[in-house]
Amino acid sequence: MIQKETNLVVADNSGAKKVRCIHVFGGTGRRYAALGDQIMVSVKAAVPGGVVKKKDVCKAVVVRCVKEQKRKDGSYIRFDENAVVLLNAQGEPRGTRIFGPVARELRDKRYMKIVSLAPEVL
């Protein structure tokens, strides 16, 4: 579960390394984001010469979450870290590579570009 003020790792090569959630999309009363949900993030650490800089605000999608999530077949999926992929205004990834595995729930939420770039889909 991702909520406001949650620190996350960036799983792409957009230039950001660490970000913080500042808003969860999906209504005024929505508190938590899970796998495949969009959030608004603020960049807290970035590499020099990257596409995004520190203090930038951008949209992101959650690709890995520590809190386990139940699937329709009854199994659970969870990861060791909270990770996001940064998105542009059209909803496509800002980076050209994805690092680490991503959840299969992204395919259900129509993030095909992220699924195709990922080295592993769990």
From Swiss-Prot:
Asked whether the UniProt record includes RNA-binding among its keywords, one would answer yes
InterPro entries assigned: Ribosomal_uL14 (IPR000218), Ribosomal_uL14_bac-type (IPR005745), Ribosomal_uL14_CS (IPR019972), Ribosomal_uL14_sf (IPR036853)
Do the record's keywords include Membrane? Answer: no
Any one Gene Ontology molecular-function term assigned to this protein's record: large ribosomal subunit rRNA binding
Q: Which GO terms describe its biological process?
A: translation
Question: Pfam families from the entry?
Answer: Ribosomal_L14
Q: Which UniProt keywords apply?
A: Ribonucleoprotein, Ribosomal protein, RNA-binding, rRNA-binding
Gene Ontology terms, cellular component aspect? cytosolic large ribosomal subunit
Among CDD domains, the record links this protein to: Ribosomal_uL14 (cd00337)
What family name appears in the similarity comment?
Belongs to the universal ribosomal protein uL14 family.
Its biological function?
Binds to 23S rRNA. Forms part of two intersubunit bridges in the 70S ribosome.
Q: How does it assemble?
A: Part of the 50S ribosomal subunit. Forms a cluster with proteins L3 and L19. In the 70S ribosome, L14 and L19 interact and together make contacts with the 16S rRNA in bridges B5 and B8.
This chain belongs to the protein called Large ribosomal subunit protein uL14
Originating gene: rplN
